[in-house]
Amino acid sequence: MNRQVIEFSKYNPSGNMTILVHSKHDASEYASIANQLMAATHVCCEQVGFIESTQNDDGNDFHLVMSGNEFCGNATMSYIHHLQESHLLKDQQFKVKVSGCSDLVQCAIHDCQYYEVQMPQAHRVVPTTINMGNHSWKALEIIYETYVHYVIPVKQVTTEIQHLVEAFVREQQWSHKYKTVGMMLFDEQRQFLQPLIYIPEIQSLIWENSCGSGTASIGVFNNYQRNDACKDFTVHQPGGSILVTSKRCHQLGYQTSIKGQVTTVATGKAYIE
């Protein structure tokens, strides 16, 4: 039996365990490789990204591709951490290319090893109602270039609500333009977010320990609710906290960035069938 060798590192950005693959593979294999690596019986993580380039020619060639071609804020922070650990960065501010985002992503390294990522811009923000089970829930629908989020205010995150959300996500026929669908259960009083991310391409549905893009959506939610900017607003999540800075400009729309810390927990080789 031939087994394929995968060179990887595993990172911890606020509990959202992330694997970045260093070895080169055909893009058609990304989903299959990721599904095996993510399994609880394997290396185990919440998402997998593939490093396509660590070269920096004019700041445009750092390139990260996620297994479902989605954008991921925590994986981008993990990629920044990798670039810094490998001494590949010349400046504290730079840009990287990430799947699911047509523009280059502005990044920065701050004191105390905080990494900041400029997040994709919301294209449309509208209040809506979601019918789940026998209940109707008020939500804020936030549509991005390649994904959609629903921020649902809750007083408490319960198992019952989580099951309703899971069923809702699976039952919908999502547009092919959405690489990911996020259901963000948000307790405003505690500033606590419980994020669910669904990736249609690989049929991955995970209650994440933390979510960078979801944190950005909480920033947009705050802007919309309070009609005011927020800076380094702490969003607590099951695996840790992420900071969000967000403001709404009349001409530019919502401008949002997230900031967090990352640690390396493992590096080595994995074997897949």
From Swiss-Prot:
Signal peptide boundaries: none
Gene that encodes the chain: cntK
Role summary: Isomerase that catalyzes the conversion of L-histidine to D-histidine. Functions the biosynthesis of the metallophore staphylopine, which is involved in the acquisition of nickel, cobalt, zinc, copper, and iron, and thus enables bacterial growth inside the host, where metal access is limited. Therefore, this enzyme probably contributes to staphylococcal virulence. The reaction is reversible in vitro, the enzyme can produce D-histidine from the L-stereoisomer and vice versa.
Enzyme Commission number(s) from the entry: 5.1.1.24
Protein family (similarity comment): Belongs to the histidine racemase family.
Official protein name in the record: Histidine racemase
Outcome, altering residue 16 to A: Significantly reduces histidine binding
Subcellular location: Cytoplasm
This protein's UniProt keywords: Cytoplasm, Isomerase
Assembly, per entry: Homodimer.
GO molecular function annotations of the record: isomerase activity
Catalytic residues, chain numbering: 72, 211
Induction (free text): Up-regulated in metal-poor media.
Consequence recorded when altering residue 47 to A: Significantly reduces histidine binding
